[in-house]
């Protein structure tokens, strides 16, 4: 470049001034020649930064070179210094300007990345909503077709999944729709009706009915001695073991809208009610005996206060007919796969035996839900063995004066939730018996001397 060459000439001129051709007198005020320093300074001041063709082209380099060469010859030190300072200031300003532009570009790139993430999350959310809407629309179409077939007294036929999906993918007018979602009759013209997938109670022949009744009788006889020999667990309500799913399915009937509304109202999670308390209440309220198909379950609406749980419950796979509790349990394990993921409330002490039994059954319930699929021999929360985590949690929520007794009770090897609940209930039974000390309130902190609560009678 010409600029380094000018600097090299300037250094050589400093050490060998005799090489200069011009003298300082040549640039005297009386001369009419134009001062190259002033001419170059004017060009620099009027040049636009950094888009000017003058500042970015060969014209600037040549002007700088000739100006430095002139000052080297006339030995004008001040002019050379001012020129260098002017160029240094110009380069510094350009550098600061470019640095600001780069910073703005980086901020813009970060904003675009953040917008991309937000847009991706929004798209996923809308995609999930669309899937839920398609699922609900499919269920409504099947149910409407079932109602129309009953009104028009048409024979029962199997629902065609392809026709239902085709209706969802295009505009659908329920007023003009002819209700054709059934599979086509085979070429032989067989009039034997097949069951639609949404019907709950199939019509059985006399032979199959006789076989089913015989199977029920054998099942009841086999279950009778087991129920009698099992330990009776005393809870707030009597515990009734559910029948087999096949028996409950055969007894399934179509619920009316009033029944579904009442069922949803009684099993909906209450305000400030923890999820573990709510799921145990559904179990105790007969949720394990209330048989529903998927359409009836979806008709109940959101039952939990957790929005993510409700979304999962609306998209559970259709596995036929099952109990209300099983529908909720299937969504539960997807929302909270382990007991650690279920956020527990602040530790609260329980002040009565009934509350302690209820609290222990809640711990057993959430433990059972997480291992329900791998432990089919456990038929309820009462069959769950006391684990170390359950023991620590339960003892931590116990009053300080009761901890030693409760801890020693829970340390028995292989003891279950039902066994502990039964032993705690024995304290209530003992407190009901009259003694010389008199009767005490059931489950209160003032019980007989046989229990570790005796010193709390005055509290």
UniProtKB/Swiss-Prot annotation:
GO biological process: defense response to virus; response to virus
Keywords from the UniProt entry: Antiviral defense, Host-virus interaction
Listed InterPro entries: Fv1_restriction_factor
Gene Ontology CC terms: Golgi apparatus
Composition bias, Basic and acidic residues: 213-223
Region annotated Disordered, chain positions: 192-269
Residue stretches of biased makeup (Polar residues): 226-238
Functional summary from the UniProt entry: Retroviral restriction factor that prevents infection by gammaretroviruses. Acts by interacting with the capsid protein ca after entry of the virus into the cell. This interaction presumably disrupt the capsid thereby inactivating the viral genome, making it unable to enter host nucleus and integrate into host genome.
Protein name, per record: Friend virus susceptibility protein 1
Species this chain originates from: Mus musculus (Mouse)
Gene: Fv1
